[in-house]
C-alpha cells in the first residue's frame, strides 16, 4: 500500500479519482463476479472462501493457526477436551499395575523325596491310595501335624523352629487370624513301617465349629477320618459333633491323641496319671461312638492299631507297633508285633521271669505302657529340657542319636524337636494306622456310593463306581470350589469315582437340582487343566483315574455348591450325588447393600462368588429388595464380609446389624375346622393343624424316617415309635416344605364321606400348596416347624377343568394358613449350645454373663487332669452377639467359649396379642418378646405390621367364625 496516499488514520489524501468511469466499471465487474460466485456456490459451497481469502473479514478468534485434532489423528479417533481437571489429587494420573493376591503359593515346584512321576504312577493303583480327612476340635494340632508330613516329604522346606509353618493355611486371612477357615487338600507319598509307599490324599479341615461345613465337604470325598484330640483338653464340643458326623457319613474312624508333650511339660503329670488320662480319652471316644453307631465292631484301641499318639510340635508320632519296632531295631531278636499287643491295658512286665502278666508282680510295678513307652519318653524330654550340658550327650549316644556341637547349642524347643525327630524317625505309625483301618478307594467305593449316589447301585454305572473302574464311564463328584489367587475364577475340587477325567475333555456338569425328568440344571463344559493339589502348589497332570482327588479348571460356571461331572453322551441314566448334608444350621443373618447404589451389579457378582466359596452359606433377596446372607456364626460371617468387599466385588458395602431366623409353630390343635373354597367355588378343602410329637421333627430332618419309604414301612415306624394309629400312619402324604421338612400332611378323610379317587387326582396340587405354605408362614414369612396338618374333608369338582393346579394350590396354601392361625401360633427362636473353658475362679463370672443374656448353665465340671473347668450352657442366638467379647472382658481373657446351633425353642409370649405396646429403645419384658420379634421382622421384610386374616379366611369361613363366637386378636 502507498503510504503517501493515506494519512496516519487511514484516510485517503491522494489526487482525485475518475469516479464515474471507475464506478461503472467497478459495478460491472462486481456484478459479474457475484453471478460467477452464485454459480460456484451452487456447485460447491465453500469455494468462495478458498478463491478469495483476501476479500473477507476474519475475526481474531476465528483465525486458524493449528490443524484440528481430527485432522491430526483421523476421524476414527474420538478426542475429548476437558477444561477442568476432575481427577482428585489422591488418585495418580498413571495408576500402578494392581495385582490381586489373596493366597500364599509356591512359585516353583519344591523338591520332594520322591519323583513326581512316581506319584503319578501310584494314582493308577487304587489299592495303594488312601483318602483321609484330618478333623478335630479347634487348635488340637491338625495343621501342625500336616506340617510334619510336609517336612518329611519336602526336605528343602525349612522353617524357623520357633514358628509354626502352617503350610495348609494358604489364605492370608488364615495366617493373620491364626485359625483355619478353608479345608485344604494335600497329596503326598508316605512310607509305612515296612518301607512300602502309599499315596495319601489328606484333607486338613478347620477346627472351629462355625466352619464345620468345610469338614462336611472333606468327609464326602474321603474313605475315613483321623480324629485329632488334644491330650490335655480331651474330648471337646467339636470332637463329639465330628464323631457323630463321621458315623452318620459311614466312614472309618481312627484317632490321633496329639500334644502328649503337654501332659509332661505343661501339666507335669506323673507317668501313671498320664496313662489314666490317655485311657480316659479313648474310653470317652468309644462311649460316643457306641451312642451314635449301630456297628458293634467299631471300637477304638491302641491294641487294634487304630489309635496313635503324637506331638506335632516336637515331631513325635507313634503307635504301639511303631514304638515296639524301635525296641526291635535297638535290641534285635524281638517280635515287635507280638510285643506291641502287650503294651496297653492292665498288663505288667516281670523282670525276673521276663514275662508279661495281668497281675502286678509287686506293688510298685508299672503297667507295660508306662514302663516301655511313657517312662522313656519322659526321660528324653526331661534330659533335653533339664540337663543339656552334662548328661545329654551321653544319653543321646546310648540312643544312637548323634548331634553336632552347633545343634547342641540350639534353644530348648528346636533342640527337643530335633532329638525327637531323630529318635522317632518318620511318621510310619500314622501311615500303618491309615493303611490298616481306612479302606482304599476300591474297597470303600461301594458303601460310599450306596450312601451318596441318588441313582441305582445295581446299574452298569453303579457297578463301575462300586468297582472304582478307571476304564468305566466318567463319574466325578465335586464338593468344593477354590478361587484362584486373584479371586476372579474358581476351580472345582472333587473325587473321580469311575472312569478317567482328561484335560480338554468335553463333560456334562449336573447341578444339585438335576433329575432325569428335569434336565434344566445341566450344562456341557470343556475341562481345562487338571491338577493334584498340595496346599501351596499344584502338580499339573493330563488325566486323573478313578479313586483320586482332582482340581478341575473350566467347569466352575454352572456349579454353585456341589456337582456331578459325567460324559456328555452315552451316559443318559447318570443321576446326581446328593447335596451335602451339614451338621449345623445357618441361623444368623445380615443384610448388605453397596454404599454406591450404582455398584449393585458388582455386589451381586460378589455374592455369587462368595456363595460358591462357602459351602453352607445362603444368600437370598427379601420381598423388600434387601439382600440377606445367612451363616453359622459371627466368625463365619466376619470371614464372609472380609472376602465379599475385598476379594470378590472390590466395592464398599454397608452391613446391617446381625439378626436371626425364626420359625413358626403351634402349641394346640385348631379350635375349629378351617375350610377354604377355590376361586371358582367348585372345590372346598377342610383342614386342622396340631403340634407334632416331640422328637419327630428332628427324626425327619436327620433322615431317620424318609417319605420315600413304602407305606407299610412308614406306617410301622410311626406306629411303634410315636404311637400313631396305623390308618393315620399309612395316610401320610408328604413332609414339608421339602422331603426332610419338619411338618407332616396327613389325609384324615374317610372313604364313606370323600371320593378318594377324586381327592387322589388333586393330591399333587394339595401337597404343593402345603409345601408352599410351610415354607413361608403367616406370622412373618418364616419356615413353619413341628406342625401336623390333617385334611378332614374335601369337595372336589368332577370335571378336570375345574380342579386344575391354579385353583387347588393357592386354596390349599390358604387353608394351611387358616388352620395354623386357629391353633394358637407361636414363634420359635434358635438356641446355641455354648461350651466355655475357664479356670475355677472364673466360673462365677461365666454364670453372670450368661444370666444377663437369657442363658442358663446345664453342666459345670472340671476337666480331668487339668486345672480348667468346662461350663456347658444354652443361650438364645439373638442374644449371643458379642457374648464372647463380653465373657473375656469379665474373666480378664481367661475364659474361652465356642457356640453352635443346638435346637429351636418357643419364644415366650403371644405374637398376636395386640394389647402389647412395643416401646422404642426399651428392652422388652419376657412376655412381650414374641410380639416384638414378629413386628420387627415384618417391618424389616417390608410386610404390613400385623397379620391380616382377610387374606387367609374366605367370607364363608369368617361367617362360621362369627357363628361360633370365636374371638380373634387379628386385624381384619
Swiss-Prot record:
Task: Report the locations given in the UniProt record.
Answer: Nucleus
One biological process GO term for this chain?
Answer: mRNA splicing, via spliceosome
Q: Compositionally biased, Acidic residues: which spans?
A: 17-26, 34-48
| Record domain tr-type G: where | 127-409
Asked if the Swiss-Prot or TrEMBL record annotates the protein with the keyword Metal-binding, the reply is no
Question: Binding positions for GTP?
Answer: 136-143, 204-208, 258-261
* Residues recorded with modification Phosphothreonine: 86
Superkingdom of the organism of origin: Eukaryota
In the record, Phosphoserine modifications are located at: 19
Offer an example of a GO molecular function term for this protein: GTPase activity
Q: Name one GO cellular component term.
A: nucleus
Instruction: Give the position of the cross-link Glycyl lysine isopeptide (Lys-Gly) (interchain with G-Cter in SUMO2).
Output: 64
* Region listing for Disordered, in residue ranges: 1-54
Keywords tagged on the record: Acetylation, GTP-binding, Isopeptide bond, mRNA processing, mRNA splicing, Nucleotide-binding, Nucleus, Phosphoprotein, Spliceosome, Ubl conjugation
InterPro entries for the chain:
EFG_II, EFG_III/V, EFG_V-like, EFTu-like_2, EFTUD2_N, P-loop_NTPase, Ribosomal_Su5_D2-typ_SF, Ribsml_uS5_D2-typ_fold_subgr
**Entry-annotated residues carrying N-acetylmethionine:** 1
Where do we see the Glycyl lysine isopeptide (Lys-Gly) (interchain with G-Cter in SUMO1) cross-link in this protein?
Answer: 64
Keyword Hydrolase (UniProt): no
In terms of Gene3D superfamilies, this protein maps to: 3.30.230.10, 3.30.70.240, Elongation Factor G (Translational Gtpase), domain 3, P-loop containing nucleotide triphosphate hydrolases, Translation factors, Yeast translation eEF2 (G' domain)
What's the subunit arrangement here? Component of the U5 snRNP and the U4/U6-U5 tri-snRNP complex, a building block of the spliceosome. The U4/U6-U5 tri-snRNP complex is composed of the U4, U6 and U5 snRNAs and at least PRPF3, PRPF4, PRPF6, PRPF8, PRPF31, SNRNP200, TXNL4A, SNRNP40, DDX23, CD2BP2, PPIH, SNU13, EFTUD2, SART1 and USP39. Component of the pre-catalytic, catalytic and post-catalytic spliceosome complexes. Component of the minor spliceosome, which splices U12-type introns. Within this complex, interacts with CRIPT. Interacts with ERBB4 and PRPF8. Interacts with PIH1D1.
Briefly state the protein's biological role: Required for pre-mRNA splicing as component of the spliceosome, including pre-catalytic, catalytic and post-catalytic spliceosomal complexes. Component of the U5 snRNP and the U4/U6-U5 tri-snRNP complex, a building block of the spliceosome. As a component of the minor spliceosome, involved in the splicing of U12-type introns in pre-mRNAs.
Please give the family membership noted in the entry: Belongs to the TRAFAC class translation factor GTPase superfamily. Classic translation factor GTPase family. EF-G/EF-2 subfamily.
Q: What is this protein called?
A: 116 kDa U5 small nuclear ribonucleoprotein component
Query: Which organism's genome codes for this protein?
Result: Pongo abelii
